[in-house]
Amino acid sequence: MGTDISDIVVSHQTSLKDQANQVFAIDTYNILYQLLSNVRQYDGTPLMDSSGNVTSHLYGIFYRTVNLVENGIKPIFVFDGKPSPLKNRTLEIRQLAKEKAKAELEEAISRGEENLKQYYSRINYITPQIVNDTKELLTYMGIPYVDAPSEGEAQASYMTRKDADGVISQDYDCLLFGAKKILRNFAIYGRRKVPRKNVYRTVYPEYVMLDEVLKKNGINQDQLIEIGILVGTDFNEGIKGIGAKKALALIKKEGNIKAVLNKIGKNIENLDEIIDFFKNPPVVDVKYVFGKPDPKKIEEFLCVVHDFSRDRILEHINTYVKYYNKSVQFRLDSF
């Protein structure tokens, strides 16, 4: 979900080729939820193998990783760890929304509706099996992954202050965590339908630079965090009626979030803890190593274990190995 500060960010249209020869830390759960929502069969049910295992995520991770490497990008996947207790309320709200969607799905089925995608797409769970399958596929593809101690986007953002060039994520929360660069829309560009509306718009890959956002708005990192909190984050609901532009104006006028809250007579529970979490989240220093792809293992895992089309997979495996060899050169260098 993240924080909606889009009205005050500076974004630049780009292409994957323009980002070549860079290392990107990927907010993996952000990507997995996209895949589980969007990669579905015509009736809305997720892709599954003959054993009934969901494979939507494997389809998406494989093809998106091929696309990244083909364009010269070195990806490192970052997985979420244990969520902060500050996130409990948000997780409860999401669970209630899923239960409501389940009830609506059952009603739609009983009415005989055929297109159930809008219901299924709102009921997504990242299970331990989905996580383990994703890691297994990445291992066969020679792609490193990192287990974050807590929030994946916090770990990925921290990595941009070390060795990574940026974060791949749709969430602007990464800016609050200090990511120096975000790459958005890398896999959803093109003509896309606006959710719940019969309207289409063209989406392009874009990048956002943290320093540019701060400079444009005349604020520092602490103030950006406080703007995000006023708008709402995964750790708080925000103040009703305050969007990014209004939050920016209030912070610049009053100086800090506590002065703003005092001025408008509002309160944000656990404010100090939320601010501290954005500034000092649990992260780890890691050494990531790019391995050598194992085409046979990739083929066996996708085509034998999970029933993917062999002809199509083999074609893309060959493409992947070709470009991986060129961009990563099978070196066991750490970044």
Swiss-Prot record:
Residues 115-255 are annotated as: I-domain. InterPro entries: 5-3_exonuclease_C_sf (IPR036279), Flap_endonuc (IPR023426), Flap_endonuc_arc (IPR019973), HhH2 (IPR008918), PIN-like_dom_sf (IPR029060), XPG-I_dom (IPR006086), XPG/Rad2 (IPR006084), XPG_CS (IPR019974). The keyword Magnesium applies. Mg(2+) 1 binds at residues 27, 80, 151, 153. Residues 1-98 are annotated as: N-domain. It comes from the Archaea. Keywords: DNA damage, DNA repair, DNA replication, Endonuclease, Exonuclease, Hydrolase, Magnesium, Metal-binding, Nuclease. The keyword Lipid metabolism does not apply. Pfam families: XPG_I (PF00867), XPG_N (PF00752). Mg(2+) 2 binds at residues 171, 173, 234. NCBIfam families: fen_arch (TIGR03674). This is Flap endonuclease 1.
